[in-house]
Amino acid sequence: EICACLVGSEMCIRDSSKYSYLLARACQYRRFKEFEDKHLPLTEKIYGNQKQLVSLEQEFDAFVCGSDQIWSPLLYDPVYYFNFLSKGCNIRTVAYAPSIGIGNALLMRKEQIALMQNIDYISCREEQGAQIIGDITGREVPVVLDPTLMVRPADWEKLVNPVSQFENESYILCYFLGSNVHQSYVDRLRKELCCKIVNIQMFNRLNGTNADYQVSDIGPSEFLGLIRKAKWVCTDSFHAIIFSYIFQRRISVFERFKSTDTQSQNSRIYTLLNILDMEKVLVRNDSVCNMPERVEHLGSCTALEKWKDLSLEFIRKALK
């Protein structure tokens, strides 16, 4: 399809790497769509704007938003604060595990703060965010688990699609969203483990990890498959940490932002590692050979169960 589109528009791509990248992205889009169609029970009608959402007010007793960084002031969208509901309507509103991403309350927008005040039940995904929202709204804001951690590992296993190319390969999986790909650390780890590097190529095409294999066409199931089979994972990604924990992979976690960055999103990583009892896997200095302990089981299942109970209690209270 993408080839036909390019030819039909008489577009000439001189850089073959860009053409290959477009093909990979088209394949990735198809895999995401297939995953959505197969696993997500969505309404037939798509509600794509505030005007369309207004029509839902008479159909539901409660509205729930969450999670991820839907409350980041850098990605502000009033829909995630239920601005489409009429004032005074008798509908319960719940925010489950939204993340504001940043640690600087001064970055919060005035209209964002005003809309927060109207939400009946609010929780947050990270401790620093919960404190900021609590100070803004004047109420206690509990920290709850990301929804991915509320699902049993056995259920995630069912969604795994192994990437056949690497089924018989021993590899370190790299997945970095930030511009720092921590090459010196990855190279030392490669030497120590005597295995190859597989890099998931997302936003780092110009500054990517020097890997044996570059992967840019995977969908959600293949993403799970790559983590599930990895000998070690190197990442600065929140959800790559979660799935490494779920599949019990050894992992090195890196900070995506400098501590002096006013737009730093590191606080959610710190909270997650604390909840999972995995603080020791955080690498703060690439120049030091700071390899995590070789333990067979990373994290505390007991601690996670406690957090699951607290998170479910919030949901029950909000929707009772």
Question: Over which residues does each language-model region extend?
Answer:
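Single conserved hydrophobic/aromatic residue that forms the stacking wall/gate
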Residues: 1-8, 12-13
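Conserved nucleotide-sugar donor-binding subdomain of glycosyltransferases
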Residues: 17-61, 191-193
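Donor-binding and catalytic core of enzymes assembling or modifying cell-surface/extracellular glycoconjugates
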Residues: 196-240
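An anion/phosphate-binding loop that grips the pyrophosphate of nucleotide cofactors and donors
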Residues: 60, 119, 230
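A donor-sugar binding/catalytic signature common to diverse glycosyltransferases
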Residues: 226-270
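Leloir-type glycosyltransferase catalytic cores
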Residues: 214, 270-320
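Active-site donor-nucleotide binding/catalytic segment of nucleotide-sugar enzymes
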Residues: 61-111, 137, 143-213
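Active-site-proximal region of nucleotide-activated glycan assembly enzymes
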Residues: 14-37, 78-142
